[in-house]
């Protein structure tokens, strides 16, 4: 490092300063006026002055107009690219525009030259011309006095702070135990230290300017854009930092004008089931101004505006297509990106910040998008900032200014045209073919930048030195002077704020606060969001209908369960049960409102829609509470209809009193309960940050609500430490009201009078509330004696429920508005404790690690001059020759065609594609968006799971065998890795399973170390993969993806799908030049790439170029300087490629890529008829002929392949099980969440039912305590399934196609790993529940049996979860099915309805329910031989006949074998008879017997074994056979016979006797 701070080179004259100093003098006195015919628009002088009065800039001299002048105003494709210029117009044929004095304009506007109502102004017509539409709009806006805000932004001393450090340590299961030995971390010190993300930024962006933000990933580009827009959620801006918008402070601007500065995130968030038209029409409606052109209605204005934007961005054909997402089929990824762009354009914001919005777009589309931004800035005055990772020279030249960031420090800010010269004069060398954007970013990469000769010790090296150099430069001084003039023009809070307020107020609707950032009032927001909520429901009708049907089916099941309940005292428990079920199911059906991460269709899923709501709130579309209120309003009618159907079924089928008054009271309370519980669950979801948090809290809350309803634990048996829950439980008030409503005024015949032969006053009914000598029991007396309920409380309870409802709705709306932002933190690496590299530093000097500054003539740094030469050294480096095994096999494909069926219609994705890949060559696969590049790659790699592929794919002339996938590497576009593993462990896992058994483990691991060195991953080889932001960054993940495939030593070919996607230009260069090195050393490589720069493109040897429809445009050599490729296109009619033009972009342009691109030449037809195409076929024939001769020379003794997998089954099982154990161990949140759920639930149940007495109610409560333990089953299952899905996704997407290990190994490993934790959970639950509930007096044998049952139950839960999720696509779908099945199991286990009371149809359900045997075994073991001591209200109290004792009077009853016990046999009055004498008698009513305990235990293990076999069978039938493309035999047989049955039915109905073909051979094809 230089001893002195770097200075500007003294030997070089500061030509920049002299040049721009002179420009400042000339600009302020002789500012050029733009040509009036640039767009053939002639605005009035007032508009001209308003637009250009502040255009002078110390850096600019009219250059911003030069680019536009070169674009032909007559070229409609160029004009269609105008993106966000205007957002207010309609050409209503029946309305004439008016001038300011009230006069009407003529139907033919001479200024625009277009007749209002002309088809060119209708975006739905093919004649639509956006240019003419914009001209008409501009004129009408001027005449009607409609204004729009315009503003620039200035930032001074901008410093942004975040939390986090450069490194964190991975937590494990034992981390909580080690925390006391790390007091610093325990106290919060050192865990999240403050970190400066942006250091002291300065700059000014004038209105209408376009700023490019350049920097490597992690340099602070996103944070800078967020700071400009004021969206620093979780980050902190220093007090000294100043940001203002033409004099308006950011605080005031964001408070009153939030929607005027918007930030477009890199990811897209939309409601997937809304169509594109609905999405954009909503955005237009939310920002529709109050004053509109031509006096149009809001509906017409917003609809037309959305249509215009869809036409501009090439989305008109998707109007009725769903937006979709990763789970819902919709528009393509590129189209979804354009939907996001159009949404922001419709916001009409004068300041827009775009975060890598060109990601995933091909170069032609990216260029169109950038041109659209440019025109929006120049014509609409929009100030725009765009962070971009890979920018072509054409894109770079469109921008006015550029800011370069280096590790959070500003190292340049100024005009784009001087940036390159600035860094060259600093001493850096720019290679001739490198784009300016790549060069500017490369100077921030020590491994990429090149110093000029003689400047090696003078150039800055670190980010701090670059920043120091910048601050001492004349360009910075000029910038500061310009900022001073900017502030002088716009004094703080003066003038411009009132102007902005006036313009904003003009756009606001009535009843909207003047200082509100929103344009429409709250009622209008609620109405708009309510309509959208119903659109979302309609968009996912199937899901909505399925949910409602499942609820109705549950009502039918529960109602039939209690069908024909006797209207006697024996029916009291059944009535309590059916009402308990009714209120519980009504109340808890809203719990699904919490979960909906992948289903944002329901208008009540706060967590699912939160990112979308946050985005729309930032765009000032609506208040968050308006969306929340709209969800409530939209949901009430749906809930009402569902509740009506549900409660009619359960009320009348369940045997409740058929009284109109009582039914409507029943419905009123159940409906209010639904709304109240919905409000509670909404509040819970809105108050938490993630769905798992909300579900965890909901699980505990539901347990408390169920126990303290009053049914499972009667109020008189509640202990004081938890009884308070009863008073805050809405379900408890509803249950009391419904129960007293049902029995009020009714008397019930005594089913079992004691003694049955008594008369007069000499008998009693053994039911609470009974009166001696009466054969019936008052319902009111029963509920008062049993529950202390009163009919007088019914309307009081309704008032309490309404109070709960209002309170939670209010809290929900408030929390929805306040709990939107999420904390942000700096990115960091995660290491295992004890594995941090010794030389690792948080922000180390990469220059020193790189070994100094590179020289311009160093051959290791210069790009190769010919495609066959050695590639330059890049970040992934090292010795490659000794690592890559030699390859000799040639992979060829001929006439590959791929057809699929979509909605019953055939579609061809690939059309007769031919080609080959030789060892030692690097082949590029390119094409326009939607051409089928990834599809072709999947087809060649044998990774398609649907459709029909035809054609020949050969290796050395032989058909592909079962080992092909194992012998090839496939680097997917998505970097899928297990987040808990380290880089080295991931590579070793791949080497262990994918290299053959003949290679020793030592050799495999040595090869892994070679791969680590080859990819330069030494610094993070022990880092944990983690999640984005908390682990490896984008480039490191991509290197790991490549490394995993290299570690497998692919013998044939390496496929790569978009290896540079999401990377900056330097990282992309590193990856591609590394691939070049692999090819030079014998590897065959085929890679798709969509945005290659000129120097990247020349790294490839051969190109396969596809057009839409999967048709070949070109296949052949690229040639030196792309001469071979360019000659082909130029000789077939294409315009010549310019000497400085990027050949990759040139090709995309000539074939008509981009939303509005067109080509007059059908290039696929040209290729098909070309000589080059015939040469390809001849070469394929020659290759096949040569390889066939070679194969014949070797005879039939070809090397025998080891088979589908490289390693045997046992080795696979060991490796995979070890990794899954490792994943669980390193995911303490899951393990501790599981254990704490079991511990907390068991303790809560145990202390709620603490030491129940031996009364009949006490025994019932004890049985309910066991029953409640089984209710945590559902929560456990919901926890297990997402973990399984995580492993399965990785296996099915990457490891199974690579033939790393068998699907049977995957299933067994996941089953095995769950068992130890389930055993531990069973032990915890056993100790936490049974000791508090039953005490320690049980024998050791019984305690042991209880422990065995608890462990068995939790193992059953895990295997059941895996059985359900095995064949289903996601945890949400499986969770719904599991919950339904669990509901059936607990319903029919004999606790809530005794088996002998079940209708005959349902008795089989009691026998097949696994919970029946678990509850039976636990209850029999706990209550066997327990003596019953009836409570006072449970005794049958009566007087014996005069002169007889109680024993004498009941002697006949005792001799008949009555189960009860007489407490006072010698008394002559007030005989006290308890109907039961032992716990076995009580259990016998539920058919639970002590003698069945071991039988039940054995049946439990049978269910576990069944779950395991069913898991394997379901996975095989649904996912293995389906993915293999083979027909499912069972489904085929069923389908065949159903079709035959249907044929006979049709013949019978029509009276025709058709003969159905049932020949043996036809059935044989199926079987």
From Swiss-Prot:
The keyword tRNA-binding does not apply. Residues 1-37, 1172-1202 are annotated as: Disordered. This is ABC multidrug transporter MDR1. Residues 167-432, 891-1134 form the ABC transporter domain. Disulfide bonds: none annotated. Glycans are attached at residues 149, 157, 356, 819, 895, 912, 1253. InterPro entries: AAA+_ATPase, ABC2_TM, ABC_trans_N, ABC_transporter-like_ATP-bd, ABC_transporter-like_CS, ABCG_dom, ABCG_PDR_1, ABCG_PDR_2. It comes from the Eukaryota. It is a multi-pass membrane protein. It holds the Pfam family ABC_tran. Induction: Expression is induced upon exposure to a wide range of unrelated cytotoxic compounds, including ethidium bromide, ketoconazole, cycloheximide, fluconazole, griseofulvin, imazalil, itraconazole or amphotericin B. Gene3D superfamilies: P-loop containing nucleotide triphosphate hydrolases (3.40.50.300). SMART domains: AAA.
